[in-house]
């Protein structure tokens, strides 16, 4: 009987399930969107039940489309939007909406904590104190949901990022992996354990926390009533770490960029924990008793800016239209768009930056905004890569995610970076990374060498822009960013 791997890829706006075979081919996909909820300006939530329903529906659809039986699934891997914070009881019932990574409700709280504990947090977690991470979200829930702290003290509350919630619903086990734990701001990435001092700073009782395991081991088995089979759930990694693994970026200095709702650039630093003032240090994965680390630059809004063109100001009907519009111009004609809708992430870390379009004239049209949006994605990526280059040598950028289908963007990215940009044959690298981690745990694949041999380039974009143009464009971008920074403080003063 042929055996396959099921990968669950739970994102910020949709839940996907993908069936892979041994050669990394995609046999079946299920994908369902779920809504985001915005109870106040700057607040972003999900209903955890809507996440679960979309994910479970996606699982059933993927199995059906792959024309296989659940008994043919050798293992399940889970990958997820990170930092998003959920609390639930032991029956699996959510006790509040999930607070999404994009949510800014704890920005002021974090500013206070940052003043006193910034260095401690950076040293232990590799993270820059920001409302983006789970710790402040969990503190907010414990402090603001009536009765939650009391229940937590009694051991009646379970906390987790989305991977933990899904694994709990699938297996009844309360676990996470090193990569997801490293994004909570409560986990010591050197000792590989929850940190007592950090728990005290954020007022988190240890009893709510999941057990932390490697990224590739059996965490539990699916409850038989769900799929009619007890399938090992044996891979778990945050979406960006999973993409790094799916890109076969196993060696120090290998870099990938995922173009999704936001852009996330990771550089493998091997067994070395490297620190940068403006980048995050994170656990890439734990595998076979060894831990690999990474430098990460998180850009909060990139693909979401294209969604805004479509759904917010309605100047495009679909994302691919941006390429056609951008190509109508020979240059950006001085128009820049800084999509700082929820502040700016790496390397700026300005919670109070806001979106800005500059350089508009009477002749500015849809094509200028479309081009400026695509160029902004590339500029924001360069901002991060430049920071990384101070610590690790970078020869090329391996790319994945929806926006990599846009050849205009990929060529502009190569031009503005002055580096090769490589798009792989299998675009589903995030889901594939989770599948690889799950498969390795049950000996479906033999090891990293076999996985490396499966990775193939589909297209390589080489830089063709002259140095003077590159320098001029990037200088304009930096000026635009300066004007966007701190804007929320100006208007709130």
Swiss-Prot record:
Which residues hold glycerol? 82-83, 132, 239-240
What job does this protein perform? Key enzyme in the regulation of glycerol uptake and metabolism. Catalyzes the phosphorylation of glycerol to yield sn-glycerol 3-phosphate.
Q: Name the HAMAP family on file.
A: Glycerol_kin
Q: Which NCBIfam families match?
A: glycerol_kin (TIGR01311), PRK00047.1 (NF000756)
Q: Which residues bind ATP?
A: 12-14, 261, 303, 307, 402
Binding residue positions for ADP: 12, 16, 261, 303, 402, 406
Gene from which this protein is expressed: glpK
Q: Which GO terms describe its biological process?
A: glycerol catabolic process; glycerol metabolic process; glycerol-3-phosphate metabolic process
Sorted alphabetically, which keywords does the UniProt record give? ATP-binding, Glycerol metabolism, Kinase, Nucleotide-binding, Transferase
Q: How is this protein annotated for GO cellular component?
A: cytosol
Enzyme Commission number: 2.7.1.30
Pathway(s) it belongs to: Polyol metabolism; glycerol degradation via glycerol kinase pathway; sn-glycerol 3-phosphate from glycerol: step 1/1
| Class in the EC hierarchy, top level | transferase
Give the reactions, separated by semicolons, that this protein catalyses: glycerol + ATP = sn-glycerol 3-phosphate + ADP + H(+)
**CDD domains in UniProt:** FGGY_EcGK_like
The family note in this entry says:
Belongs to the FGGY kinase family.
- What would be an example GO MF term here? ATP binding
From the broadest rank down, the organism's phylogenetic lineage runs: Archaea, Methanobacteriati, Methanobacteriota, Thermococci, Thermococcales
Residue positions binding sn-glycerol 3-phosphate = 12, 82-83, 132, 239
Organism expressing this protein natively: Thermococcus onnurineus (strain NA1)
- This chain belongs to which protein, by name? Glycerol kinase
Q: Give any Pfam family that matches.
A: FGGY_C
UniProt-listed InterPro entries = ATPase_NBD, Carb_kinase_FGGY, Carb_kinase_FGGY_CS, FGGY_C, FGGY_N, Glycerol_kin
């Amino acid at each position: 009987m042929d055996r396959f791997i099921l990968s669950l890829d739970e994102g910020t706006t949709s839940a996907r399930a993908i069936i892979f075979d041994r050669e990394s081919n995609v046999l079946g996909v299920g994908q369902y969107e779920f809504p985001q909820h915005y109870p106040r300006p700057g607040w972003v939530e999900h209903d955890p039940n809507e996440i679960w329903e979309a994910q479970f529906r996606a699982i059933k659809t993927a199995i059906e489309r792959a024309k296989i039986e659940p008994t043919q699934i050798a293992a399940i891997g889970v990958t997820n939007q990170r930092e998003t914070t959920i609390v639930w009881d032991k029956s699996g019932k959510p006790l509040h909406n999930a607070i999404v990574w994009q949510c800014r409700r704890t920005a002021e709280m974090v500013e206070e904590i940052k003043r006193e504990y910034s260095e401690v947090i950076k040293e232990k977690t590799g993270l820059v104190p920001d409302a983006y991470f789970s710790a402040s979200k969990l503190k907010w829930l414990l402090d603001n949901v009536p009765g939650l702290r009391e229940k937590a003290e009694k051991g009646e509350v379970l906390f987790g990022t989305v991977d933990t919630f899904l694994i709990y619903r699938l297996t009844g086990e309360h676990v996470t992996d090193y990569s997801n734990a490293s994004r909570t701001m409560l986990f010591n990435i050197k000792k590989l354990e929850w940190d007592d001092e950090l728990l005290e700073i954020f007022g988190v009782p240890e009893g709510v926390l999941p057990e932390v395991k490697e990224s590739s081991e059996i965490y539990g088995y699916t409850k038989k009533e769900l799929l009619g089979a007890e399938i090992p759930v044996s891979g778990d990694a945050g979406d960006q770490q999973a993409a790094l693994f799916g890109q076969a970026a196993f060696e120090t200095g290998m870099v990938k960029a995922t173009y999704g709702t936001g852009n996330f650039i990771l550089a493998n630093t091997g067994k070395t924990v490297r620190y940068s003032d403006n980048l995050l240090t994170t656990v890439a994965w734990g595998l076979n008793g060894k831990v690999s680390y990474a430098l990460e630059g998180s850009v909060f809004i990139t693909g979401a800016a294209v969604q805004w063109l479509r759904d917010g100001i309605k100047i495009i009907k679909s994302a691919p239209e941006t390429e056609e519009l951008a190509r109508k111009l020979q240059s950006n004609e001085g128009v820049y768009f800084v999509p700082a809708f929820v502040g700016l992430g790496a390397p700026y870390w300005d919670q109070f930056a806001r979106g800005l379009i500059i350089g508009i004239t009477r002749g500015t049209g849809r094509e200028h905004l479309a081009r400026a949006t695509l160029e902004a994605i590339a500029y924001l990526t360069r901002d991060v890569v430049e920071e990384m280059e101070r610590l690790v040598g970078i020869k090329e950028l391996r790319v994945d995610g929806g926006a990599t289908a846009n050849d205009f963007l990929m060529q502009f990215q190569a031009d503005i970076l002055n580096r090769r940009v490589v798009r792989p044959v299998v675009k589903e690298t995030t889901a594939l990374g989770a599948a690889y981690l799950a498969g390795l745990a049950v000996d479906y694949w033999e090891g990293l060498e076999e996985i490396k041999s499966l990775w193939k380039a589909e297209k390589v974009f080489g830089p063709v822009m002259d140095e003077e143009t590159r320098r001029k464009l990037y200088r304009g971008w930096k000026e635009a960013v300066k004007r966007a920074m701190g804007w929320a403080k100006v208007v709130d003063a």
